[in-house]
Every structure is written in C-alpha cells, then in structure tokens.
Amino acid sequence: MNESGMTSHEIWNSILNQTPTSMPIMYSNGYTPTNSDGDINPWVASTQCGYNEQWWNNIQTNITLNQKLDFITKGLNFIGRFGFDTDNYNFIKRYKCPALWSADRFRKDDGTINFTRKRAEQEMTQTSGNTGERKEYFEAELQYNRNFKSHILSGTLKYTQDSKVKTQEIGNDIKNSLPMRHQGLAGRIAYNWNYRYFLNFNFGYTGSENFAAGHQFGFFPAYSVAWNIAEEPFVKKNLKWVNMFKVRYSWGKVGNDKMYEANGTTLIRFPYLYTIGYGGAPNIWGDNAGYYSAFGGYNWADYGYEKYGTTLFQGLRYTSYANDGVTWEIATKHDIGLDMSLFDDKFTLTIDYFHEDRKGIFMYRRYLPATAGVENGMTLPQANVGKVLSKGVDGNLAYKQQVGSVQLTMRGNMTLSKNEVKDKDEQNNVYPYLMEQGYRVNQAKGLIALGLFKDYTDIRNSPQQTFGAYQPGDIKYKDVNGDGIISDMDRVAIGATTVPNLIYGMGISAQWKGLDVNLHFQGAGKSSFFINGSGVRPFVNGSKGNILKDVVAGRWISRDESGTESTENVRAEYPRLSYGGSNNNYQESSFWLRDGSYVRLKTLEIGYTLPKPLVNKMHFNNVRIYLIGTNLLTWSKFKMWDPEMNSSNGAAYPLSKSITVGLNVNL
C-alpha cells in the first residue's frame, strides 16, 4: 500500500485550516504556494511530499489429525491440531517537500508578481521500520459421543498451549523478546434425555506466564441446565404448533490475564517483577559524600565532589514496584434464557437476561499512602482491585411467511445493557459525584451549561468561572456545589455513556420467482459524546482556516456587530467567535454533548436469478445478477459527521458508502 509522505492527519488539518482562497494549487511559474503562516495546501501535501510504502506478509499453517478410537470404545475420537503463523509489517517512508513561496501584496514595478520564499526545499529523506511476530498453537482433544436409547452423552477433554513472540522491533528491553504463553486443560460433559432435559458441565484450568508462581493458574468452572417443554408429551399432544420451548439457566466463571499501561494499548509484562534503574541527576546538598537524588536512588561521590570534580557514581533504585499477588481477573456470569420456535419454525425467538459480576479488575494503585514509599516518577503497581457489575437483555427473532408466490422473512435483534462501577482505586472526595464509583463505565462527565452570558451585568451577577478569560457570548456554567466558584469540582455525570448501551438491527428479505431483495438496518442508542476540534472551534490555533456555515449562522453575535439586540441570543447554538481559542468555552460540558443514537440502512441487496431453461441453453448451471449497496442512508439527530465513527472531531476515516454491481455464473 502506498500513501503520501505526509500523514492523513496532516492532510486533514491542511484542509480544515485553510480556505479555498488562501492560495492557488500551484503558481503559473511552477512555484509551490504557501500563505503568510507557511502552510501547505492539501494538494501539495497529498502529491508533492514523497510517499510512504507499506506491505504486510502473513503466513498461516494449520495441521489437523483426526483419529477414530472406536476400537477402544464406541464414540471415542482423537483430534490433534498444530498451528504456526507469522506476521510481518514493513514500511519505507521517503519524505520531501518543495520550496514554498508566497505572493507579496504589492507587485514589482514591471507589474509582475513579487514572490518571497517562505521555506527552502526539503531534500529527500528516508526512514524505514518493521514489526513482526510468530504464533504457535497446539491442541490435543479427546471427544466422546454416544447414544444410549433416550440418553445422549458427550464429553471433551482438551489440552492446549499457545505462544506468541515478537520477531522484530524488540528494542533493548529483554521482556520484548520473551514469548507470551498460555497452557491449559479444559473439559466438558453434556447429557440430555430425549432432547427434553439438558445438563452441561464445563471447566477450564488455565495458566498464564504473566503472573508469579502460585498465581499463574486459574480454575474456571461453568454449568448449564435446560428444559425443552415442547418435548413433554402433553405439549406434543395438545400444542402441536409449538416446535420448541426451551428454558435454560447457566452459570460460569471466565478469566482475563491481560493488563495494559495507561495508554490502554501496551501490554504489561510480568507485573510481579521489580524494575531497577540508576539514580537521578545530580542534586548535591552541601558537602555530603553520599546524597539522595531528587529523582530517587542514591548517588555517590568522593568528599568535596563539587570542589575537586571527582567522578559521580550513581546508585540503583526501583523504577517500578512489583506485585507478586496479581492474578486472574474473574467474571462470574449468570444467564437465564428462552429459545422458542412456533408454527413449523415460521416464528423463532431467542431471549437472554445476563448478569455479570467482574471482580479483581487490574488497575494502577494511584492513591497509595506516602508510607508505602512510592516516589514521583515511579511506575505504580497494578492490583486486582476493580469491580464492575453488568446486566442486560439480549435477543433476536425471525418470522417467515409464504404469501402467494412471495417468500417473506423478517428478523430483528437487540442488546440492551447497563453497568455500574462498584469499586475502583480512586481518592475519596467530599463530593461523591466526582468519583467514578457508583456510575456507569465510560459515563460522560462534564460541566452543566446554562447557556451564554448576555452581557457584563450577567457576568458580574454570576459565580466566578476559573477556566480563563470570558466575556459576553461565552458559555455560562452551573455552580453545582454552591461554593460561588465554577471549577473542576462542578463536573457531574451528564448524558449517557460514550459507548452505546443499546445496539439493534432489523431486516426483511423477499423472494419472488427469480427476484430477491434483502434490506438490513443497523442502529445504536443510549450513548453520548462530546464534540471538539477545529470544526466547532474555528481559529483555535490563531491561524487562518475554514469555518462551517452552521457555526457562522448559529453563533452569538454582539449587537455592536449586528446592529440588533436579537443576535445576542443566550440560547445560540454556538458561542461567540474567538481568535486563538477560548479555554472557558472549550470545557467538556452539556453545551458540547451530543446524542450518539443513529439508524442506518446498512445493506440493500437486489438480485435476479435467470430462469433455469434459459440458463441451460447457455450451458450454465446458474446465473445471478445483483446490486449491493452499503451504508446508503443514516438517520440521526447529529448531522455533522457519522456518529458511528466514534470521533469527537470528525477527523477519523469515515465509513464508505458503496454500490456494487456483480454477476455470478456457475458452470
């Protein structure tokens, strides 16, 4: 894959921060244009600044051995699997940039344009890099399946082990060269009597190299029971239209061994080991022979170090604390469900109520007492201290019906969930609403906006806001704690969570003779997100740039500018325009909170299968012409960009809308 030498982020910024009249694409004399700020126009950024070449190599190898063992006992089977995968990524980036010129305001005496070079040509530079990893997987499984008249028994005993190791870009940290490994034994026993009563038991005994000895293995049992009422004789005799009516309950435990650093993406390896480094920079106090560095660790030198310039010997210190008690994060799950099929399977329904109690969630101990000896700059220890309770409903249904020569199918699915942070390592606060405990995961929090300041009298009669200078037309916030000051102490839960709590879909399919039509809708709800970025904060960096028409039309405007008091609307959609930014207006608050709900026509497919006699004459088995459209329509209260992008500023790559026309021919 090839792309510009400038990143997509830089190109988008070029588009957002310039107007179409800022500069031409190129000057007629071949000069590359820029403005007074030295910016590059989007065309130059995309086509004239080198290129970045990337390629990926992936090899997957799988070997499976399947051996029946009926000579030992009927129904016994052995399966062995081995997998070996390698993934490699490489890039070569060659970057250059032409000299940039701006046209002066005044022409030369002969009438020609006078150009000033703003930046010299940047000659080609080259950088390269690569990443790679190797994965191995081994599995040995014994399966048993046997029917004893009305009794059906099955079982599985499985041994697994896997390994993943980096093969490139491992740096100088020895931990990067060590493989991540798991080893486990799992089993399952399933019994049902006459497809009426069901009983299952599962277990997993899994080990992870990421924990200290004695904490590496976890035992994760599970069981389920079910009763298919439709198989009871009185139902089969009197309610023949009931094909299946199964009620079920399951309970189980699952474990997680993955811990991440504060960025949320980098895995933490071996949290049970201390990390040791040298003491910090010299910080001599008096004429002591040994002294403690401001950054931790003892530094040693001869007496009179400053006077005689003797060598400094740095001592060692802990740079991160260990916790040899860290072990598996465990979720205990309960599920009550119903599976139903009626009218010769024309109507089917599956619905589940789930309840999950997740304990021992990994998190940094950020609020340890000073007596613990944790110093500034040290990596804090992780511990199993978090707890989250989740519950919700999940279901899907379908209905099939023949109407004349038309075959109709309607379907739908929905997941509605809710969670609560029950325990978290956070500091107690006099204002409980500032804590995350008691609220939902990813709960949107911010200030409550009361509108915009109308005038200076309104400002004088309102609590002081501590986020920088403000004036009429700026956002006015609520003093939640009543202390007369608007600060971070006034941030509360507002709106929903930033991740949808409701996800659903619905569709309909129809077939008539050779014509088939399929529609699928996708939706999400119960979510909120904050908007920011240059789209709603024009001129935030004090530079020239584009401005959205909605921002211009919907902003607060002083009567001195408009000539009418009506434009000083305290309920305006946007605050006054400001050059160089306004920290007061850029706080996360209900003013910038938006509803993330949407419904999308995800897929529309129309196809036509040619009649069989015609296809036979063409010496084919089947011919179908089709048209598929994806992401064709979206309905949402939010209109600025696609709410499914999960972006606060719209500067992410959007979902593509596509129409595909195709032909399938089977010979």
What are these regions (language model features)?
Residues M1-Y95, R105-Q443, N584, E588-L667:
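Extracellular/periplasmic, surface-exposed regions of secreted and cell-surface proteins
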Residues V44, A524-R624:
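Extracytoplasmic gating/loop element in the C-terminal half of outer-membrane beta-barrel translocons
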Residues K74, T497-N532:
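Glycine-rich, aromatic-lined ligand/substrate-binding cores of catalytic
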Residues G155-S163, F198-G207, K476-V499:
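Catalytic-site beta-strand/loop segments enriched in glycine and acidic/polar residues
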Residues E261-S293, K400-T498, P538-V540, L548-K549, ...:
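Conserved small-residue
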